[in-house]
C-alpha cells in the first residue's frame, strides 16, 4: 500500500506541476481517494462505506491542483475573488469540516478556505 500511495503522490505532483512542498497534501489526498473506491482486500467494498456504514459522497471531489478562486470580503470596491499566480491557485484537498487547502503564489503558505469557486 505504501508504494501505491507514493506512486499516486508522484503522479499527482507531476501532473499539476506543484513543488515538492505539497507532498504531504498530495499523500493526504491520495489516501482519501483510495478510501473512496472499492478495495480487493474487502471483497470490492468501499472502505469508507464499511467503516462509516453509509454510502460515501463524491460530489465535492475536484482534480488535484485545479484553479480555485477564494471569496474575499475586504471591502465594497475591492475584488470579490482572489486568484493565485498565472498558473492559478491550487486546490489541494477537501477536509472533513468542508475546508479546502489553497496555495496562492510561490511564496505564500497554503490557506484554508470554505467559500471558493473552482474551475476544472
Swiss-Prot record:
Domain of life of the organism encoding this protein: Eukaryota
Listed InterPro entries: Retrotran_Ty1/copia-like (IPR039537), RNaseH-like_sf (IPR012337)
Principal cellular location given in the protein's record: mitochondrion
Keywords of the record: Mitochondrion
Keyword Mitochondrion carried by entry: yes
Any one GO cellular component localisation term in the record: mitochondrion
Annotated compartments: Mitochondrion
Name of the molecule in the record: Uncharacterized mitochondrial protein AtMg00710
Amino acid at each position: 500500500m505504501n508504494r501505491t500511495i507514493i506512486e499516486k503522490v508522484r503522479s499527482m505532483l507531476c501532473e499539476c506541476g506543484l513543488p515538492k512542498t505539497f507532498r504531504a497534501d498530495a499523500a493526504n489526498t491520495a489516501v482519501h481517494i483510495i478510501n473512496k473506491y472499492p478495495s480487493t482486500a474487502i471483497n470490492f467494498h468501499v472502505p469508507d462505506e464499511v467503516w462509516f456504514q453509509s454510502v460515501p459522497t463524491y460530489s465535492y471531489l475536484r482534480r488535484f491542483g485545479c484553479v480555485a478562486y477564494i471569496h474575499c470580503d475586504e471591502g465594497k470596491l475591492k475584488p470579490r475573488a482572489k486568484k493565485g499566480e498565472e498558473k492559478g491557485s491550487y486546490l489541494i484537498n477537501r477536509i472533513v469540516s468542508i475546508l479546502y487547502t489553497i496555495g496562492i503564489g510561490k511564496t505564500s503558505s497554503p490557506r484554508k478556505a470554505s467559500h471558493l469557486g473552482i474551475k476544472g
